[in-house]
Amino acid sequence: MKVTNDIIYVGVNDHQTDLFEGQYAVPNGLAYNSYVIRDEKVAVVDTVDVKFAHEWLDNVGAALGGTKPDYLIIQHMEPDHSANIYNFMKVYPDTTIVANEKTFVMMANFFREMDLEGRTLEVENGQTLSLGKHDLTFVFAPMVHWPEVMVTYDSTEKVLFSADGFGKFGANDVEEDWDDEARRYYIGIVGKYGTQVQNLLKVAATLDIQVICPLHGPILKENLGHYIEKYDIWSSYAVEKEGVMIAYTSVYGNTKKAAETLAAKLEEKGCPDVYVCDLARADMARAVENAFSYGKLVLATTTYNADIFPFMKIFIEHLTARN
């Protein structure tokens, strides 16, 4: 799939994984995105999950059309994006890997059997790599959401390769609302690092961005202001929904009745949106996502073994871990 005349999408869809990172339900699957930039020099941007090595390498080969890649750019070392580095280098051994210092430290630990002597290009923050007519500038984005992360800006095509930023759950062959699954992805995975995301958004504001190419989810070409605004809201912990979320746990139904009574009273008083959540039955990631969206949060819980009920304790731990 063409992103632009010179940029080809070579990612894959994953309908095998049911829990992303062992905890986030993904009923509509996932996408692991990767890109080929064709120019006088050819660059491949990131790899995909190891389960899809053959499909991805086939996609890369088709995009290359018989040419050889000059560079493999690694923006993020999480295994769903880095696992095929070694497989790629076995197929294309003359490729130079482009990454930053922290990435190469991780790479040496992840792939101890891989000899990269003479096949690396270590870049600094703000450094530019020319492919010919395409100039790629590397912007470090530490803790968005790993310490080595960087993003890549193509000033020729006005494309931002945003690593995990602006990603979402869901495979790219499934139609679904971007906001809901991008919010759940952001709050769950990146939500702890709002300050770092804000720093990256400030840099992005200085760039002329017409296309955003994330490592998960769809390529964003239209209404970019909407997506950037959402990231600004989420990363600044601003109120997205005017209303109240009531999160409760209940053993014999009494706390549930209290929560429902409060919800009814709030609605009578004109509260624009009341969301009641039974934490024992809700998807915890969805509950945490909603807690960050609403301006007001009410917690109602019974005790259990002389302590807070377990599901409420887990919920509070999720909130404090991301604050």
Spans of model-derived segments:
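Metallo-beta-lactamase
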Residues: K2-N5, D49, A99-E222
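Conserved beta-strand hairpin/beta-sheet module of binuclear metal-dependent hydrolase folds
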Residues: K2-V60, V151-D154, K158-S162, T255
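Short glycine-rich, flexible loops that bind phosphorylated cofactors or substrates
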Residues: T17, K221, N305-D307
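Active-site neighborhood of phospho(di)ester-bond hydrolases with catalytic His/Asp-centered motifs
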Residues: V45-T47, P69-M77, I97-N100, L160-D164, ...
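Active-site metal-binding motif and surrounding structural segment of the metallo-beta-lactamase
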Residues: K51-V98
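Short helix-loop-beta junction
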Residues: E260-V274, S293
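Helix-loop-strand module that forms the ligand-binding subsite of alpha/beta enzymes
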Residues: R281-N323
